[in-house]
């Protein structure tokens, strides 16, 4: 199996393995699915952390309004009254004004937070360092864990406009957000290796050869963005160590320049004629007038 270290720009994303005979049409779609799936997990984790702290989403027409404005406009959060957390709620005001402030109790909050940490670990970039291959099954498992935790804490479900529910139903609206710029559609995805685009009409082995033990770094890119930057000759960690070495060397040379004491030149070992006198047997001869 060929090992693919998938990157986006200079950032490591995940490891994937595929036979050399894999069609690049299929492989590109697979990489894009895992890449987008990981983004989805991270978006859900971010929103679920807010859910644990401040409760469900307010209706769009109530978001950002003060309590006085809501009373004046006679607006009512009907879904907020239905979607009550299991075990009761604790009021924690959302300063941003996106959520209703009816947070779950401490026990239910920990259920959400623990599940979020576990899901993050499954799709973490640290899996690259650990040598763990991330598959679509692992991404789905992380999503199922998150869905299960929400069902435990909110047995009555979430409002239809809550971004967590919309993510689970694949109805999320990312337009105008930074998250929208990160997503790469399967049909628009490109894989690059060694400054060459891996054409969808070919097989992986057409580029990397027949050796199934090959490991390559591929970069996923949106069509039309051009070739990604080449990999640096040395990694950022190696560059850091190199700079540290030269800094230490400079400090040592600076100290040597400051230490201009030449008294050591009077030492026996500094006498360049000592060896000659030793062989002539004239070592330690003292001359004095009679």
Curated annotation (Swiss-Prot):
Pfam family for this entry, one: CFAP298
Record InterPro entries: CFAP298
Keywords: Cell projection, Cilium, Cytoplasm, Cytoskeleton
Chief location bin: cytoplasm
N-terminal signal peptide: none
Domain of life the protein comes from: Eukaryota
GO biological process terms on file: cilium assembly; regulation of cilium movement
GO cellular component: centrosome; ciliary basal body; cytosol; nucleoplasm
Subunit (UniProt): Interacts with ZMYND10.
Protein family (similarity comment): Belongs to the CFAP298 family.
PANTHER family per UniProt: CILIA- AND FLAGELLA-ASSOCIATED PROTEIN 298, PROTEIN C21ORF59
Protein name: Cilia- and flagella-associated protein 298
Gene, per the UniProt record: Cfap298
């Amino acid at each position: 199996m060929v090992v693919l270290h998938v990157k986006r720009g200079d950032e490591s994303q995940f490891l994937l393995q595929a036979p050399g005979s894999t069609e690049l049409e299929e492989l590109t779609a697979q990489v894009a699915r895992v890449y987008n799936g990981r983004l989805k997990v991270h978006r859900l984790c971010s929103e679920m952390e807010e859910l644990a702290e401040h409760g469900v989403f307010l209706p769009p027409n109530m978001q950002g309004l003060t309590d006085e404005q809501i009373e004046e406009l006679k607006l009512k959060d009907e879904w907020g009254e239905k979607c009550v957390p299991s075990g009761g709620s604790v009021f924690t005001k959302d300063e941003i004004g996106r959520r209703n402030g009816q947070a779950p109790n401490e026990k239910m909050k920990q259920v959400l937070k623990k599940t979020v940490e576990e899901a993050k670990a499954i799709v973490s970039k640290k899996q690259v360092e650990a040598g763990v291959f991330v598959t679509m099954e692992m991404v789905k498992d992380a999503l199922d864990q998150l869905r299960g935790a929400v069902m435990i804490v909110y047995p009555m479900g979430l409002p239809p406009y809550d971004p967590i529910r919309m993510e689970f139903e694949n109805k999320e609206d990312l337009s105008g957000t930074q998250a929208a710029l990160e997503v790469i559609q399967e049909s628009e995805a490109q894989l690059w290796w060694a400054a060459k685009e891996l054409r969808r009409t070919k097989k992986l082995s057409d580029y990397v050869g027949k050796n199934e033990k090959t490991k390559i770094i591929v970069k996923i890119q949106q069509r039309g963005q051009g070739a990604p930057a080449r990999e640096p000759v040395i990694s950022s960690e190696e560059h850091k160590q190199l700079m540290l070495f030269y800094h230490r060397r400079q400090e040592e040379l600076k100290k040597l320049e400051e230490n201009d004491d030449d008294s050591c030149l009077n030492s026996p070992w500094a006498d360049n004629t000592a060896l000659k006198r030793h062989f002539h047997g004239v070592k330690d001869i003292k001359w004095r007038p009679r």
